[in-house]
């Protein structure tokens, strides 16, 4: 019996260049292509949480400031969060299409040059 899907969860510590929205967009776009998956909509990258005071941006929740990015897939989604005050990146790749988590790890390592990490690979809906 084939499972419903696969989740790869990667938490990266001491990662580099985490506040670059364009880099995050290109990272997700390239990752989707490397996994031979198809987008179901537009990639979204949001910088936050931010508020404005006297017309200038100020960070809210200082230790959680970063990017939130989402790539909707025909087969599910890729979600990434960065917390640049802590040099932390967390990535979730969920898809009902089978894929190689090592490819995700290697490309993320190449792009964000992290030092330490934690990872989990979960088979979802085993009795689907």
Name each model-derived stretch:
Residues 1-128:
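Polybasic/polar functional segments that serve as interface/processing modules
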